[in-house]
Every structure is written in C-alpha cells, then in structure tokens.
C-alpha cells in the first residue's frame, strides 16, 4: 500500500505562485479606483465653496456679503439637520414604542390613552391599517395620476408640463394613538369619535415642471380628528352620513427635496409650513368640515353647515405676578404683557400694557363655539419686544364645563411659567329664537348672531355694461376690455355686517356660480344693522350686483329663518342670488333652581362676610343656646345662605386684603341679614377692639382668588369655648351650597391655656378638584397654636405629598414664615392627576420648622394624613386639622 502524498508540499508549488503574484498586484488598481472618485469629489466641493469668494471679489462686493451668505447657509443647514433629527426620532419611536413608553413614561408627548382614562387604545385598528396600507397606496397613486394631475395642468398654461415623476407612500402608515367616544343623551341619533391621528411617513413624492424638480421625502402630521356618524338609521346602511374635521389646527412638518429645499431656509420654512396648515384648515378645521353621505338621497345640508351650539364671552380682566422678561444686566425689570385668546381658527389679541407685572385689561372677546366637548379656550400671554416676543404663560380651559355652569369667574394659574395668575370671567350665551330674548344694549356687546348660507347666483351679467338701466351702454370699450368682457365673469361675494367683512371663494368663468359657503356675524343691534352684499368680478374688478337687506325683516319669519332668492340691485333684470339667513338671539340662561353647583368654580358663591365682634372687658359670654339662636332659627340652610347673600349686594367683591367693616356706634337690635350669626354680645358705650372673621365663599360674583385676609390684633377671649361651637355650625349650615370654604378664622384662639398641653397645633386646608384643569387644588390657608422651637417662636413651612408618590420632584412646599406660631400662607398647589386616580390617594401634609444646617432645633412640628376617598372633591372641603406626630387623629 503506497503512502499518501502530503498536501502541504503542494502548496508552494508552481500553480500557486502566479496566483500570489496576482494577489500582490491587485490592490494597486483597486486603491487607485477608490481614491480618484474621492479626489474628484473633494476638488469639486472645494471649488463649490470657493466660488462665492471668487464671485464676491470679481463683482467687488464687501466681505459683509460673504459673512451674511455663510450665516444664512449655516442657519439653513442647522434647520435641515434639526428636521431630519426629529424625523429619525419619530421613526425610532414608531419602531420601539413599548421601550420608549416604559423609559419615558412621565414625558409630556405621550399618546393620549396614557394620560386620560377615557381615551382607549385601538391596536386592532392599527393592525388593520398596516395590512391594507399597500392597497390604499396604490389607490391613492392611481387617483393622483388620473384625476389630480390633469386638473393641475388645466389650471394654467404654465403648468402644462407638470408631472408626478415619483409617487411612493412608504412603509410607514398613519396610526391611531387613541379613541374617545362621546354620546349625547339629548341626541341619540349620532355617535361622535375623537381619533388621535399620528402620521410619521417615509413617503417620497417628486414632481417636475419644465425640467425643474422638487418634492417631499417625509411628512409628520399630528392632530385630533373628529368623526361624526349622523344620523343613525333603522335600516341599511344604518348610518346616513359621515362628517370628518379637525378640532384644532394639526401640527405639520414636511421634509423638502430638490429645488424645494429652498423652503427650508430661515424665515421661509415657518412661512411654508404655516401656509400648508392654513390650506388644511380652510377645508378640514372647524367650522369647516367634510361630509360624505352614505345613504343615497339624504339631505346633508344641515350636517355640512350646522349652526353654532353657543357663544362664549371672555372677559379678560387682569393678571398678577407675571414673570419678568425685560431684564438688563441681570437686574430685575418689567414686562410688556399682552394676551392672545383663541378658539380653533378664531383669534383675538388684547392691547399691550407697558412695564407692568400686574396688568389690567378689562377687555371682552366673543367666540362662536361649534363642538362641545371638543373645542377649548386657549389663552397665551407674551411680553412684547422689538425682536421676538417672550412667552409669559398659557392657559387651556375646557368649554364643556363652562357650558354647564353658564358663568365662571375665577383666577387661573398660568402653565409653563415660573409665576403668574390670570383673572377671567367666562359667560356661556345660548342661541334662542324667542322674541322676548331680543335685547338692545349700549355696552357694545353682541345681542344676536347672523348665519348666512351663501348658496349660488344665476344670470349674472358678464360686465357692468350689460346692465339694462342704460347707464353704461353709451360708453365705448377698448378692444382689450371687449375681449375680457366677452367671457363669463369670475365672481366672488363680499358680505358685510357692521364692521365685519367676509369674502367668499372665486368661481372662475361662470354666469351661474355656486359657492356653498357659510359666514357667521355678531350682531349688536338687530333693528339698526343690515347685511350688505356685493357680487364682484375678480378680473374686471367691478361690481356685478349689490344687495342691502335689513336684519329686522327676518323677525317675522318662522324660526327666525329666511331662505329665498334675492333680486340683485344694479345688475341684470333676472340676476338672482340664493341665500338662507338664520338669526339667533344671545342670552345667558340661568341654572335650574335647586340644582347643585358642580362647575369648575364650585367653591365661589359669595362672597359672604360674617362678622364676629368681641371686646376685652365688660362683655359676658351668652349661653350656648342663645349664641346659636339666630343660626339655627331656619330649617333650610339654603334659605339662610340666600338671605345672607342678599344683604351684602353693596359690598365689594374684591378678596385681596379686605378692610374691617365699621362698627355701630350705639346700642340697638342687630340686623339679622348681616350680623345675625355673630353669637357675641357688645357692650354699649365702650370702645371696641374688633376681630373680624371672613367666611369667604367665592362665587360667580367674586372676581378675586381664594385668599385669606391678614390676621388682625388678637383680643383676649374669656369666652373662647362657645366660639369653638359656633364656627363648625356655620360650616355645616353652608354645606349645601358648597362645603369648601375659605375659612380664615385665624384670629380666634380656640384653645384655653391648659387645654394646649400635649397638642401640636392646627392647620387649615382647602381642597377641591378642578374639572377645568383636571387637577387637585390644595390651598394652604394657615396654621395656629404651633409648638415653639426657640424663644422667638418658629420658622414654619408646609410640605405636601400626594401619596403614594414621594419623589422629590412631586413634593410641594410653601414659603417659610419667620418667627411666628400662627403663620398665614395663602398658597395654592396643583396636582395634575385624573379624577378617578385622585379618589384612590391621600394627602400627606407636614408642618416643619426651617432650621440652619447643623442646627439641633426641632424639625417636625406636626403632620396630617387626609384620605381623599372619603371626601367629595367636586364640591370641595375646607376645615382645620389637628396636627399629630404620626398624622392620625387623636383618639
């Protein structure tokens, strides 16, 4: 058996040598093939960058132009990178949504179903959209090429070469982040859906026009889309029509390509995005909507253009403690505040108050509201500057609660700022057809609204020379004007009521134009105002017809609605315009008698001042039954509150630092309307040292915030024990209207000297849930009878946790009051937690002593634990709590 030849020696044999040589010679050509293109591209970039320098020298331009061009290029590049970065971050969020939510659970830009329990997540719908997205893309591509492209070419002779060279809608499809369903008990024939739409697409759309190319390589669109299924039917297809619109302007960002990259230049990018947003808003944002009939033969006119559901009147009164923005060299300055008030596409701006951190506007704005719930009132405050206005804070109020409560007068804390409060009075005006609701006032406020449904016109003249009144026939026309006048007019309409003017769209080249648009006007005087209408030609810039219609002619019509064809003046004999005019009166309707007040300001029902007077000497405490005689004389607590409220109509409603009321100078019976609840006696003929207690129940007539008055000098109370019985009785009597008082009885010492042994003091808290802001509001009024830590008293402050949350970021803390055992804080804190979750939590309130670092003084002064599940948070509550070491009440 012959041995096998080894394989190793054959390796260096002849056949392998040429191969090695070939391998050793290969890197040379490859390296040269890679370096040459890179070298060419580098030289091209250098020449491209140096070209502006050469042109500047050749043209004799200054170096300033070079610096300006470089600055603009850097700015464009920065904006471009930022837009690409945001697009990549959005793609990353779509691909890793679960990890992102778990990591950034407490972020601000999370889907709505995380923050609001009534918004449902619909992953099943997203899976269906993903599955059918390729087929939808093919359908949209065919529609664009077959219908949209020919229409664009027909618009102008310069667009005849317009072509969509690429239509690719990408793999990323629209997503529904959450769905909220609204059901109206008053109208059971419709279903309303709010869809949180998010489209972060990788689409690529390219167009070409005369060898000029441009396009889009990415789109971001986010907004709330409302879908209304109305009316519901008893037979197939069970739904009459589908109405779609955005509640607010959607957020839009577009990544341009080709020559359209110029739209990303500084100053132009914001303008281009805003123009596209306005284009979408003109068709799909309230009050504009798209209605698609599902059942054949169904009249969808009222669905396409419905009447407003109401009008909200916003009284922009004042603001306090706004942030300082006009700082110079780090020194504190002032601000020049103004406010922007908006609802949907309706915007108003207040005047500017210069150099004032506590401005007073006293301005009134009126807005029409079309969808409740859905539309919100937005108020943004800015500091006016010459370059760019600084942001001072914002506020967003749900109009659904305002509609229920009719009138809301309250101070609101501003969001997204360090400090600042805004005082608003909101009035909900209902639309009525009753002739008795027609009022005339001289205050400049609206008394009615007029809704004009502009349908169409017929037999319009081609030009003013077609009038048959003989006025223009004698005039001669030039050849150019004759050629223009021979075509049908491109007409539009101008409608004016008072000082407000609207312009319709232009219908090109038609004697019988169809507009089908709606316009709404505020009317100050129905008897004096009229609707002025002009039909104008867009090309000849002349009037084709005029109509002046007094609004008082609508009053005899049924349901204050007039629909007919109107003859145009200064037009052809048979030139008519078809309209439907609807008039509605405005009035603030009162709440039903006996219904509980459950609005956003359920605390405010006054103010109700109850004055208690005591003297140092010569006054004997009345028996307990006499002290409470007037209080308990009525069996109906609501009637007591009503009677007490009537007696203070002439008292100022301001709640900031109220002054004590003057005392009577002589003996006599006390008036029961005002001071029947004193429960104290007065000694005639002696000088009194009054101590006033304000039981402030803020309400619709109270413009001020929830605030306690300053403590006054404390007299001696030899009859302090009966007072302890009087104050709780007053709280219980007023619990029907609102159990949440601003009980500022800080001047009463309810504990005798010996009874304080073993007690740590008391703290007064006012707690309620504000439905408008979806937050729990805690007002720390003050403390009394605290334990001294030094010979000068203590330096107390209050710390609050909303258990079980104990993070440092969620802690609320008042300011420190120096050297006092009865501090008055009057500080408000808000916890933004849904109502359903608040009822499962509790408040941990601790009073502490501020001490320097390393000091051995006492830190804890007392603690209170409040179980919120046992409280009525909508009405609210206000009371004194005894401080204990562990927060639990003493047995």
UniProtKB/Swiss-Prot annotation:
Segments of skewed composition (Basic and acidic residues): 17-28
GO biological-process terms attached to the record: endoplasmic reticulum-plasma membrane tethering; lipid transport
Biased composition (Pro residues): 659-670
Cytoplasmic side: 1-32, 76-891
Domain C2: 292-412, 430-570, 759-881
InterPro entries: C2_dom, C2_domain_sf, C2C_KIAA1228, Ext_Synaptotagmin_C2A, Ext_Synaptotagmin_C2B, Extended_Synaptotagmin, SMP_LBD, Synaptotagmin_SMP
Binding site for Ca(2+) 2: 326, 336, 383-385
Kinase as UniProt keyword: no
Positions contributing to Ca(2+) 1 binding: 325-326, 383, 385, 390
Residues in compartment: Lumenal: 54
Localization, UniProt: Cell membrane; Endoplasmic reticulum membrane
Entry binding sites for Ca(2+) 3: 385, 387, 389
Function: Tethers the endoplasmic reticulum to the cell membrane and promotes the formation of appositions between the endoplasmic reticulum and the cell membrane. Binds glycerophospholipids in a barrel-like domain and may play a role in cellular lipid transport.
Protein name: Extended synaptotagmin-3
Species name: Mus musculus (Mouse)
Gene: Esyt3
């Amino acid at each position: 058996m012959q041995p096998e030849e080894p394989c190793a020696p054959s390796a260096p044999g002849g056949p392998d040598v040429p191969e090695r040589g070939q391998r050793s010679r290969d890197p040379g050509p490859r390296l040269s093939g890679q370096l040459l293109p890179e070298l060419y591209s580098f030289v091209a970039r250098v020449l491209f960058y140096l070209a502006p320098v050469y042109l500047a020298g050749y043209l004799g331009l200054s170096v300033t132009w070079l610096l300006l061009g470089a600055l603009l290029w850097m700015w464009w590049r920065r904006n471009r990178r930022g837009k690409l970065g945001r697009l990549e971050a959005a793609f990353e969020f779509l691909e890793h949504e679960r990890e992102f939510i778990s990591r950034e659970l407490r972020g601000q830009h999370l889907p709505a179903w995380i923050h609001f329990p009534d918004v449902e997540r619909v992953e099943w719908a997203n899976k269906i959209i993903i599955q059918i997205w390729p087929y939808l893309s093919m359908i949209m591509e065919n529609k664009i090429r077959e219908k949209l492209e020919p229409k664009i070419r027909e618009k102008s002779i310069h667009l005849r070469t317009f072509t969509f060279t690429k239509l690719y809608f990408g793999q990323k499809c629209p997503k529904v982040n959450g769905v909220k369903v609204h059901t109206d008990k008053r109208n059971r024939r419709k279903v309303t859906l709010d869809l949180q739409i998010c489209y972060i697409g990788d689409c690529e759309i390219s167009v070409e026009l005369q060898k000029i190319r441009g396009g889009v390589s990415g789109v971001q669109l986010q907004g709330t889309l409302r879908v209304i299924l109305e009316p519901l039917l008893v037979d197939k297809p069970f739904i009459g029509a589908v109405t779609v619109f955005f509640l607010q302007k959607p957020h839009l960002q577009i990544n341009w390509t080709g020559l359209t990259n110029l739209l990303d230049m500084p100053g132009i990018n914001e303008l281009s995005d805003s123009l596209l947003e306005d284009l979408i808003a003109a068709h799909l944002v309230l009050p504009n909507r798209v209605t698609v009939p599902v059942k054949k033969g169904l009249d969808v006119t009222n669905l396409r253009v419905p009447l407003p559901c109401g009008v909200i009147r916003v009284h922009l009164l004042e603001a306090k403690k706004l942030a300082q923005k006009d700082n110079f060299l780090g020194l504190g300055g002032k601000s020049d505040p103004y406010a922007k008030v908006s609802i949907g596409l309706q915007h108003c701006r207040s005047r500017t108050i210069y150099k004032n951190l506590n401005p007073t506007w006293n301005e009134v704005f009126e807005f029409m509201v079309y969808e409740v719930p859905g539309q919100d009132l937005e108020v943004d405050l800015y500091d006016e500057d010459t370059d760019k206005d600084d942001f001072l804070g914002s506020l967003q109020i749900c109009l659904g609660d305002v509609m229920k409560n009719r009138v809301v007068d309250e101070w609101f804390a501003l969001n997204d700022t360090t400090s600042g409060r805004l005082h608003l009075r909101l009035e909900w005006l209902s639309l009525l057809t009753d002739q008795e609701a027609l009022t005339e006032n001289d205050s400049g406020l609206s008394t009615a609204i007029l809704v004009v449904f502009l349908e169409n016109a017929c037999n319009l003249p081609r030009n003013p020379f077609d009038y048959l009144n003989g006025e223009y026939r004698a005039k001669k026309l030039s050849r150019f004007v004759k050629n223009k006048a021979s075509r049908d007019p491109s007409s539009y309409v101008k409608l004016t009521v008072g000082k407000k003017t609207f312009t319709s769209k232009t219908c090109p080249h038609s004697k019988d134009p169809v507009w089908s648009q709606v316009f709404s006007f505020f009317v100050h005087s129905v008897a004096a105002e009229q609707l002025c209408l002009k039909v104008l030609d867009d090309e000849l810039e002349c009037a084709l017809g005029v109509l002046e219609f007094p609004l008082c002619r609508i009053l005899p019509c049924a349901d204050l609605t007039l629909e007919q064809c109107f003859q145009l003046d200064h037009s052809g004999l048979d030139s008519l315009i078809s309209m439907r005019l609807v008039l509605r009166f405005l009035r603030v309707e009162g709440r039903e008698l006996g219904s509980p007040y459950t609005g956003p300001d359920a605390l405010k029902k006054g103010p109700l001042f109850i004055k208690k007077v005591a003297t140092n000497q010569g006054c004997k405490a009345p028996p307990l039954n006499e002290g409470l005689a007037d209080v308990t004389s009525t069996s109906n607590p609501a009637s007591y509150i009503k009677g007490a409220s009537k007696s203070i109509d002439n008292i100022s409603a301001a709640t900031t630092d109220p002054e004590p009321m003057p005392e009577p100078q002589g003996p006599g019976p006390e008036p029961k309307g005002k001071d029947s609840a004193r429960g104290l006696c007065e000694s005639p003929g002696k000088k009194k040292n009054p101590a006033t207690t304000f039981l402030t129940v803020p309400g619709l007539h109270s413009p001020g915030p929830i605030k306690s008055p300053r403590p006054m000098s404390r007299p001696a109370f030899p009859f302090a024990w009966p007072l302890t019985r009087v104050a709780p009785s007053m709280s219980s009597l007023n619990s029907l209207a609102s159990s949440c008082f601003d009980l500022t009885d800080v001047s009463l010492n309810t504990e005798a000297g010996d009874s304080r042994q073993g007690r740590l003091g008391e703290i007064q808290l006012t707690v309620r849930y504000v439905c408008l802001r979806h937050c729990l509001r805690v007002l720390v009024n003050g403390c009394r009878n605290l334990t001294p830590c030094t010979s000068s008293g203590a330096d107390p402050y209050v710390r609050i946790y909303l258990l079980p949350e104990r993070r440092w970021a969620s802690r609320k803390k008042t300011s420190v009051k120096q050297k006092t055992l009865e501090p008055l804080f009057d500080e408000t804190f808000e916890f933004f937690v849904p109502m359903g979750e608040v009822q499962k939590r509790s408040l941990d309130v601790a009073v502490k002593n501020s001490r320097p670092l390393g000091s051995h003084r006492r830190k804890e002064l007392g603690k209170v634990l409040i179980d919120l599940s046992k409280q009525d948070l909508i009405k609210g509550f206000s009371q004194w709590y005894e401080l204990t070491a562990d927060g639990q009440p003493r047995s």
